[in-house]
Amino acid sequence: HRRHNLDIDPESLVFSTGVVPAISSVIRKLSTPAEKVLVMTPVYNIFFNSIVNNGRQVLESPLVYDGEQYGIDFNDLESKLADPQTTLMILCNPHNPIGRLWSREELLRIGELCAKYQVVVIADEIHCDLTDPQVEYIPFASVSSVCENLSVTCLAPTKTFNLAGLQTAAIVVANPNLR
């Protein structure tokens, strides 16, 4: 991940058969039945399946559309992160399906809010290499030590290089307590 300024310690790597199985495994490991997993909608529909099929509740924080692009309603996001039953957030970065690359400031604010309410971020960053070259992709974990310590980042070559049959993914978990 040298090209995206994310320093990955080999000890922080865990491997999986894919990003979706990894997300499901993390949901099972880091939450309990009936807890809530937050997603910013619209979002990749499989996230809902991964949450519900593991006995957790989906909590939606709708993105707001200003006529040109989608953005985060930080007031809504914070109110939902403040719910004590919200223990995980799935962050799609870049966002699927809207294609939005989140700014460093937006990612930092998400990280600070999640730290404030002790919510772990599952960062699905499988589309990191399929972006507009004019817009910088910023890995969530690279934004700050706070973001790095509360995140589980899921990556795979399968989308970018059309290798779906390979069934592989890497999960980056810097915090040994989450690993």
Located regions from the model:
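Helix C-cap/helix->beta junction micro-motif
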Residues: N54, K116-Y117, C147
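Conserved core of the PLP fold type I
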Residues: H1-E112, D129-L130, Y137-S142
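Conserved core segment of the aminotransferase class I/II
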Residues: S144-R179
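Substrate-gripping "pore-loop 1 plus following alpha2 helix"
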Residues: Q134-I138, E148-S151
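Hydrophobic "anchor" residues on beta-strands that sit immediately upstream
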Residues: L88, V120-V121, V152
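Metal-dependent active-site segment of extracytoplasmic phospho-/sulfohydrolases and closely related
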Residues: Q118-V120, T131
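Walker B catalytic acidic pair
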Residues: E125
